[in-house]
Structures are given as C-alpha cells and as structure tokens.
Amino acid sequence: MESVSQLVSNCASRGIPAQQFLNFYHELINEKYGASLNAGNEERESESRKQVFEDVSRELVQAFHSSEDAILLAEYMVHLLFINYDTYLSSALLPQVYSIQSETLLMHFHSLAASFIGKLEDKLIKEQMRQDLSTFILSSCLQCDMSTFNNQLFISIVKYLQALLTLIDDSIDIEMDKDNLKLAVTSLLTRTTKLNRILGKRIGREFETKLNLSLSAKLAMVNSPQIFSPSSGATRFAGTPGSTKPMDLALSATSSTSNKIQDLKLIRFYKNLWLNNKIHHFNTSDSQLLEKFSSINSRLSSSLAEEHLIQEQITDLIETTYTSFAQLVNNKLYHQTNTNFNLLERKYVHFITKRLPLIIKDFLPQNPSVIVNSLQNIDEKVKKAIKSYYSNKNDSPERNEDLFDDYSGNNFDIRHDFLKNLIMLNLRPPSVLNEFLREDQMVDVKTLKTDDSLVIVNSQGVQEKVSDVQEALKSLIADLDIENQYVANGNNYRFSPDNALLKLLMSFDTIAPTKQVEIANAFLQILQKATDTSDLKTLGKVLWILTSNVGHSTTSMLCCISPGPFINAVVKFLEKQQRNSTVSSSDEPDFDSLHSYVTYGMALSFVVFLKTTYDFDIEPFIQNFEESYTLKFLSSIEDISDIFVLQNESAEGSKLYLQNWLRDLFINGSISDSQMKNTNVKDLINLIPFIFKQSVIAVQAGVVSNILNLTSGFEYFLQPFLMPGLIKIMFWLEYYLHSLKNNNPPSQILSSCWELINILICPPSLDDDAKGLHFMILKLNCVRLLNVLYLFRNDESNSSQYGVYAAHESIDPKLEAVISKLEYIASISNIYDVDTKCYETTKEVYSHGTLFSNKIPVTNEHPIDIIMTNQLNSFWNLHSSTYYNYDYLLELIKLITPEKFLVDSIRTLTYKVAAYGIPGVQGKLNTSAIEQVANFLAYFMILHDVQTEEQRLALLNYIESGVIVSKETETKQEPETKLDDDFDMLFGEPFNNTLDETSLVFSQNEQPKSYSSSVFPVLHDTFGVVIAEMKKRYDTSKNNGLLSEAAYENATTFIRKYVENLKNSVV
C-alpha cells in the first residue's frame, strides 16, 4: 500500500491541486489506519490517534524535505494543518515543521497560513484552534531558533503569529516556561521592529495583552547574540518597485504607508497592462497564467510579497479582469478615438466568459465562494461603467449584433454571460443569476443550460447531442461543399442557413467553454493531419472555414489555443508544396494537381488573414528565411515587380514563358495543355499580377485602343488554378489607385480601369471550385480598397451639376458595382477595428464616413500631438490605466515608431515633473518624482516589447552586453499545447538620434548584423533596442568625460528604470 510520503511526492510531481490531494489523503488514512482510528474505546482510540498521526507526521516531513515544488507543498501543508484541522495531526506535525530545510517552502507555508487564518470564518475550526493555541500551536513556533532564518521567512512567521493572536478573545497562558517565553518574544519583537517598526509595535501590543506579558522594559534592554542583525537585504521588504537603493531603517510610519500606496498603485497599473498584453496577444491559454499573475506582487514589490491561497489568487484575477474590462469599455464610451477598436474587446469577452470559468474549474472546482466574493467585491464604479456601456450598446440604432440576444431585455451585460458559462460547467446553480444580479433583471432559470453538452442541428432539423467532438467535426467537414454554401443573392455571397457546421459556428459564443476548447483542438488536429497527409480536399475546407471566421469562431478558437499551432501547420504545408509544385509530369494536366492550386491559394490567404486581422507574425515558423516563398510573398504582397523573372530560370527563358502565356490568354483564347503542364503555382502567383499591372498601366498610358482586347484574357484569371494570383492584385490595387487618383486621369481612362477591375471583383459567374477562394481573396483587403474607391466616387458625385440628389446617375456603374460588391463582402466578413458605417451598403446615400489607411485617424481634430499629450498626462498622473486602450496605443506606436514615442515621452515627462511635480502627491514620495513617473512608462514599454520569458532575457542580455542571444527553430507543435515562442523576428531598426538636447558627441552606430535563417532574434520594433543605443551613447559620453556623474544619472533615469524593471517583470 502506498505510504503518505509517496502520496505527497506523487501528487506534487503531477501538480495535483491541494483540495484533490486532501481527498486522496483522507482515502489513504481511512484505508490504512481506519481500524486504529476507530478502536471503540475512547481512551484507547485517543492513544491510537496520537501514535498514528506521529507516524503520519514523520512521513509528511520526510516528503516535504525531498520534494521540490515549494508553492504546491505549502498549499498541501496548509490544507492538512488548518483547512482540515485535526488536533492530533497538528500537535504532531507543527513542532516538526521547523526542521524542514527549505526556507522557500516555510515562507510560502507561513504566508498562506496567515492569510487563511485572517479570513477564517468557520466557527468550529476557530474554537478548536483557540483551545490548542496555549498547548502547542504558539509554543511550537516560539520555541524554534529563528536566528538562522532569512528576513523574508522571518517576517512571514511574524505575520503568521499575528494572525494566530487574533483568534484570542481575552488572554491565555501558554504552556511554556515564563522566562523562556519572554526571552523568545522579546527577541522576536526586537528583530521585527528593526525590519518593520509598525509591524513590531502592533504585534508587541498583541503579545502584551493576549499573553499577559510585560515587554516594554525588556525590549529596550535586550542585546542577545541570537538576534539577527539585519543586512541591506532586509530593506527589500519596504522598497519601491524598481528601486535598488536601500531603504532608511528609520523611515516613519507615514513614509512607510506612503511607499506601500505607491507600490499598490504601480502594481494595479502593471496588472492592468499585463492582462491587456496577455489577452491582446492570445496568450491566455497558458497553463501558468494564474501563477504568473499571482507573482506580480512579489516581483514588483517585496513589501507586498505575501503568499495567497489559490482562492485569493483567483479572486484577485477576477476582480482585476472586470476592472480592466470596465476601463476598456469606459474609454470606448467616452474617448471616441477608441470607439472603432473592437477586436480587443471581443478577446476580453472571451477571456471573461470562457477562460475565467475554465480557470475556476481547474483550480477550484469545489469552492464556489470565490465567485460569490468576487462578484460582491467588484467596485461600484466598475459595475456602473460596464452597465452604462452595454446599455448604450444595446440602445444604439446602428448595432448589428447582441452578445446576449437569447435574453429578451436590454439590462444584461458581460457579468450575466460569465455566470451563464459557470452554470454550464456546474460551478454555480442557475439561481445565481437572480441571486446576485437581481437589480438588473429577473431570469427564468428553466431556460438556462445546465451542462456543457454540445448539440448540433442536422440537415433534417433534428438536434443531436455530440459525444465525440472530433469525429463529429470530421463528418461535418466531409459533408461540406463550399460551392453550395453561397446562396444566390444577385452577384453577392451569402452563407447557407441550412448547413449544420455553419449553424454551429454561427452560435459559437453560446457553446460551453470546455466544448469550445475541444472544437478548437479538433480543428487543429484535422488541419495538421490534412497538411501531413496532403489531404487537399479536407485542408481546403478547413482553411475556408477558418478564414471566413463565421460567427467570430476563428477568433474564439485562437483565444482557446493561440494562433501558433495553426500557422505552424499551414506554413509547413506552403513550404513543402513550393518544393514540388509542378502541375503534372504526364501529357495532360491532372485534375487533383490543378485543384491543389486552389488549396495553395487558400493556405496563402489564411496566412495573410492572420497577419492582417490579428497582426500575427510567421517568422518564428520559417525554417529557411532565404528560400521561404511564404515569407517573400508576405513581405512583398503590396508590390508587383516591373520585371518578370522565373526562379531558377534565365532571362531569356522567363521572357519565352511570359510570351507563351500572353499568347494563350490574349490571342489564342485558350490555355494549352503543354503550358499547363510546364508551370507551377509560385510562378503563376507572380505571373498573373505582373500581367495585370502591365495591362492597367498600358490602359492608363493610352496604349490600348480597344479594351476588349484585354477583357477576354482577364476572365481567365478567375479560373481556379490561376486565382491565387489575385491576392497580390488586391493589395497592389490600393496603392495604384491612390497614385491614379493623384494624376487626375480623364474619365475614359478611369472607365477602362473600372471595367478591368470589375471583371476580377464582380464576375457574372464563377466556377464552383473558385467561389470559396474568390470570397477569401476579396475579404483580405476589401476595407482598404473601399477607402480609395470612395475617393473616386466622391469626386464623380461632386462633379454632378445636380448635386448629391442626382449623384448616383453620374457615377460610373462599373465603379459602383465594384464598391457595392466590396461593401457586401465587408459586411459579412467580421472585419475588426474599423467603423462599420464606412462600408454599410446603402441604396440612396453615397456620403460614407471617411476611412483611413491607418487604424488611427489623424485629423485636424485629433492630431498626433494631442493624442500623445493625453497619453503622457496619464503617465504623469500615475493613473492605474492608460488614457487610451492598449490596442489603440500599440497602433499609435506602430504609426510614429517606438523611438519617437520614447524620445517625446522622456522630454515631455521630464519637463512636466520638473515644472509641476506630480499632481496630488508632491512631497509624499520616498524617491524622486521623476523615478515614479519613469516606473510607469518603463513597465508600459516592457510589456510592449516582450511577451515571453525568453524574450525578456534576450532583450536584457542585449541591452547589458550588446550580444544577441538567438534560438534554434522549433517547429514541431503538439495539438493541445499553446505555442510559447510567439515572438517577433529581429532584423534591427536603425537608431536615428533625436535626443540631441546637449552638445554631446556620440559615437556612430555599429552596422546591423546579419542573421542566419535558423535563428530568431527578438528586438524588432522594440523600445529596448532604442534604450540600448541610448545607453551606449550616454556611457560613451561619460567615459570620455563629456558627462559628469550627476548629469549622467539625471540623463539616464528612464534608461535605468527600464533596465531595472525589465529584470523584475513578469511576462
């Protein structure tokens, strides 16, 4: 039979939660010692229990000595000794606790125990502990020699004792020699007072009143060699985040309180940013998310380095999430520049309604009180902000979706959806909605789903409960005919309302969190198998589903898993296909090989979709940068070369190849079999855009007299095997049309251009195999194309002599057809971060809102300097959140570059602090005001720069040593695991010195290094690389005597704070 020691070791090695371990422990004790613990005779039973638990305690201590996971073992100890309180076990185990060698384990144990006791409400456990305080609980701690303990462990023990003393109502007499007791308490108080005067005074009063001790005189006289003499390390417990200067031990209580307030403000700010960063970058599926979140307090401020029970950690996460979400939607409601950014909001909704319930289910399946406390503790301002936002959203006449449309009223918000998902996971009863949110609106609980089952509606309209998600999806995908999912709607697309798979995806938000994860993993596994086996039919269908993003299902699946594994599988397919992409070696082209061109186009479209929609980089998944066609395609997607050259072919061979294709397309009117046989998909993807560009330029130059000479050849571009070439055309067109608009061409030239474009975008008919790919390609850049097309329509409308009332008669019908088609595509494509009014189709009105090339509109009303001023005032005021939402700020930095953002921030904040101080906190800071402001800016920049621990260490190493640590490519990815190496590639950005406020002579930058294709440096477009260059220049100036020590310290405040905080950051 397994021993208690083995049970602890096995559970710890498997990461079994403490509550589940406790259940296993009870089973083992009952099975192994049941007969001894139930002897029948009360006296014999007491002796047996003592003996049993003495044996058990020895085994437990042995296990605690040998195991390594300190945090988990500390939770086991707290559950055994206090949550599952038993006098016999505690009396045997507590005296042995201090023989454990691991100070980390002891520190976590005492911190967790103090936290539990401080919040203990169980009257029975309280009464049992009160009875045992005088006999062994207090004495077991006070009798141990604490002189060898480090300061952090010592403080945790003091707080543990303080919590125990709060259980005493009057006073007690400890069963311990009176003199030894006084000496122990006096020694403890002396050391405590030196480390934390306030804590020492408070616990001193508790000892005097509750243990009947007179300590004041002895405390002043004591000078025992046993007392620890605190070193500079002791000051870590009251320092300011990011500060490495030792704290004056004589700080007043007022100063200490002020420091703690500063720490709390900065931690709230960092948690807000950290959560935004995780959600924005699809990193919430990380199994260590809760652990990393809970470590922020200790990493940023040792004065707040208390261990918390798992219940408290989840409560903090829930409350922080709701607060951050309230700030997000409040900004959208009142700062109009944020209004059109909706992707981060959707990710937040998924995290709150789907991911948080899963975290609760994983860590606290049997403890619903956490949810109750969290909902009750949400600040009233947070509730008000959320309710106001959803009320405004539901009442808006422009709204086109309702997250909670299964409810009949408008008083529901994200809190209700959070509870609905908890109910589906059986973590809360259905009555919880009316119990906690009754002030909003009552709900008929019978209508709520109370399990996480997945139900699909088959083709006969019958509901079926799915038992095997992966097999069900395989069957639905096999039955899916893409060409039949487009219901006739003029020349537009409309998804079929009768397909079971599309119905499931359209209602994806209503599916239980557990089943969403299963569906996401099933799609990933099907995709990976299809790419590995070259199952082109299945692969094409999956890629069409994912790129279509029906019901925002793709966004939700990426939140469940992260984009990494998906992009890895598709990139492997693209790179593999490019090496063997000739249509056929037989005399006639093979149909399956031609069909593979469509699949290849879908794969490219999916990669472009991830890049343009979610700004996800593919560099980490490329094995050979020099030879990767996928990477070259993405990097030049908006550019069509003026010279056509085949890869691995001479100029003469390329010329002959081009001539043959032009002859077949525009003269012969058909494509010969030999031409088809001797081509490949890469060549066609470059050939079709080249022909299109040269044709359009020829039309613009007036070289083509009869446009009909081109139209018949252009129609061939819509053949399935040629259609992948349209991807680059759709992106290049945006820039070409901007150029065309600036040249003011005559109307007949414009009419010819619209006719050629109309052929590709608005064909009267399409081959069935081409419908899906055609829709995907048009979707990729439709909004940006509309942006420039509206300029032409507005011009034509304004030129009408009858004004806007007759504008539709003067607009070229071919231009209007193109606009109408793209507007419709946009309206059914779930486009993010764009004002939907800009592409809503209308019949009579042509005055659409203005679109912009960037997501951030820069206008006379909202110039960059005002945008920057608003955000920098937020840093200056030490707000707990940013003025603009996180997604907006990332776009802003991308627009003006990290270097300019940093330099402008340093200049502005330095001036503001010097001239005005910090609003509301002047004279209350233990460190300089500029350092406090620098902390806020530094943490913002750090979370912009790094998303993984590997990135953090690489960036820190580069700043301090100038050496770039690279990592070998790892492309293999398990289906269920999240890709942790989601990091950017460094090509390095040149640093143009704009911080030229002094007459310093800086050394020239080193030339950027070249990198091999097998490594992934991590400094591209980061503040860190700018910081490194600035640091190097200031260091050089100081070493050359151009800067004094004081001037150097003053000039590098923001640099030092960035580096110091980068060392402590949780990512």
UniProtKB/Swiss-Prot annotation:
Q: Which GO terms describe its cellular component?
A: mediator complex
> GO biological process: any one?
regulation of transcription by RNA polymerase II
Could you list this entry's UniProt keywords, alphabetically sorted: Activator, Nucleus, Transcription, Transcription regulation
Q: Which Pfam families match?
A: Med5 (PF08689)
One example of the protein's molecular function in GO is: transcription coregulator activity
Tell me where in or outside the cell this protein is found. Nucleus
Residues spanning the membrane: none
State the similarity comment.
Belongs to the Mediator complex subunit 5 family.
Q: What does this protein do?
A: Component of the Mediator complex, a coactivator involved in the regulated transcription of nearly all RNA polymerase II-dependent genes. Mediator functions as a bridge to convey information from gene-specific regulatory proteins to the basal RNA polymerase II transcription machinery. Mediator is recruited to promoters by direct interactions with regulatory proteins and serves as a scaffold for the assembly of a functional preinitiation complex with RNA polymerase II and the general transcription factors.
* Subunit structure, as described in the record: Component of the Mediator complex.
Q: What is this protein called?
A: Mediator of RNA polymerase II transcription subunit 5
Q: What is the lineage of its organism?
A: Eukaryota, Fungi, Dikarya, Ascomycota, Saccharomycotina
